[in-house]
Amino acid sequence: MKEAGAVLAGGHSINDEEPKYGLCVTGFVHPDRIWKNGGAQAGDVLLLTKPLGVGLVNTAVKAGMASEEAKRCAVESMSCLNKLAMEVLREVEVHSCTDVTGFGLAGHALETARASGVSLVIETGRLEVLPDALFYASMGLVPEGTYRNKAYNKKDVRLEDKVEEALEDLVFDPQTSGGLLVSLRREDAEAVLVKLEKAGYPLKAGIVGFVTDLQEKFLMIR
């Protein structure tokens, strides 16, 4: 909380078999500095600031099958605030922004597409993935939330036949403390990636797709 510049104002405790920690966050923002999930423009690229696969790795942890590297990388990703990425993104023109959490990359990309009146294309070959996450998906270590996300959203998604089932599970995988999905001009996205690296950003960010005029489906995964 100190890193985020927040103040803890109160709370309550519970007794449970495993540790839980949650917060309700309130704050203030200038109206001219709000980033919304609507506003993506045809021709934009999509920048994702964290690797995917937290839900898959956590499911493997619960099954006692996760590698030490996978656990370490998942904890590092979940523990990393979006603060540095946000500060770097402030230096360019952001057209839309959302965090990728419980609805997975596909679900939050769909929210952006619907709010913006455009279609988004996710290129699975460009996705950064936590170690062993796809292996766990291939073993069936898939969180229940993934199936709910698919059931709710697949009607608005065109999934190319070449996309393997494990990759499909990955894009619908619910994330805990996921990264930012941002639409912006390509040159701005490339500048952001350079600045993140120079600033010592510990995670892998990258361009994962692009925005087109509205097509038959809001989201295309290929």
PLM features per residue range, with description:
Residues 1-222:
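Helix-biased detector of long, well-ordered alpha-helical tracts
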